Amino acid sequence: MEIACPDWSHESAAFAEGFTCIVGVDEVGRGPLAGPVTAAAVRLFPGRIPEGLNDSKKLPAARREALAAEILAVAEVSVAHASVEEIDRLNILQASHLAMARALAGLPCPPDFALIDGHLIPKGLAHRCRAIVKGDALCLSIAAASIVAKVARDRIMVDLEQQHPGYGWRTNAGYGTRDHLQALLNLGLTPHHRRSFKPVHNILYQEASVSP
């Protein structure tokens, strides 16, 4: 069975429609119990596309790091975040869309067409968009965005682990692994935990119920 790889067909179709500044957008960090949600917007240029781009989840960490460096060297890139406070206030979907909108706004070239991973398009964007389900595995620009966003967020979680050791964020990136959940029970919550997420909320409620 042939394994599908991302290609340039979606960008080519947009160029054929007359668009000139075409970018891919993806986010990472919707599922973790801690840390921000991070989005990247990437404008690739034909003839300067790094080899081996793919969905960041399919790549080992060292390869992601190397590709992220290549992308930053040859593409226009913007990375943005939505904070834990925004996630808890808005909900994770709206916070993800906010991070995407911020990433798009941070590009040096105002895009006129955005290829967005998923099936929903953030509201209020001023340019044409196309949502592509599993776009990080189908579209080169989105694959590049997924890699940049993943590397950027992983680095944030490594930094946060130095401030709050014991939760394993360097390896679990804030996801609800068994060790992370056990650390929550043993060490309690940090300011970087998402109170609106059920496992965290349950622990917070338990702590409140036993307080004097």
From Swiss-Prot:
This is Ribonuclease HII. It holds the Pfam family RNase_HII. Gene3D superfamilies: Ribonuclease H-like superfamily/Ribonuclease H (3.30.420.10). Belongs to the RNase HII family. The keyword Nuclease applies. Its EC number is 3.1.26.4. Its cofactor is Mn(2+); Mg(2+). Keywords: Cytoplasm, Endonuclease, Hydrolase, Manganese, Metal-binding, Nuclease. One of its GO terms (cellular component) is ribonuclease H2 complex. It is found in: Cytoplasm. It catalyses: Endonucleolytic cleavage to 5'-phosphomonoester. PROSITE patterns: RNASE_H_2. Manganese or magnesium. Binds 1 divalent metal ion per monomer in the absence of substrate. May bind a second metal ion after substrate binding. Residues 20-209 form the RNase H type-2 domain. The gene is rnhB. One of its GO terms (biological process) is DNA replication, removal of RNA primer. A divalent metal cation binds at residues 26-27, 117. Endonuclease that specifically degrades the RNA of RNA-DNA hybrids. It comes from Cereibacter sphaeroides (strain ATCC 17025 / ATH 2.4.3). One of its GO terms (molecular function) is RNA binding. The keyword Phosphoprotein does not apply. It comes from the Bacteria.
